[in-house]
């Protein structure tokens, strides 16, 4: 039962965390370069 309910929690978590990390790293990259 734990193995069955694990993906249903893990998939949305990755779907929310991964874009957040990507946007955070992108904003840090832009602030570091100060091109704009």
From Swiss-Prot:
| Annotated transmembrane regions | 1-21
Source species, domain of life = Eukaryota
Q: What is its main location?
A: plastid
GO BP of this protein? photosynthesis
**Tell me, what's a Pfam family for it?**
PSI_8
Membrane topology according to the record: Single-pass membrane protein
Q: Which UniProt keywords apply?
A: Chloroplast, Membrane, Photosynthesis, Photosystem I, Plastid, Thylakoid, Transmembrane, Transmembrane helix
Q: Name one GO cellular component term.
A: photosystem I
Q: Which InterPro entries match?
A: PSI_PsaI, PSI_PsaI_sf
Protein's cellular compartments: Plastid, Chloroplast thylakoid membrane
Recorded hits in HAMAP family, A to Z, give: PSI_PsaI (MF_00431)
Family the UniProt entry places it in:
Belongs to the PsaI family.
Stated name of the protein? Photosystem I reaction center subunit VIII
Gene name, Swiss-Prot/TrEMBL: psaI
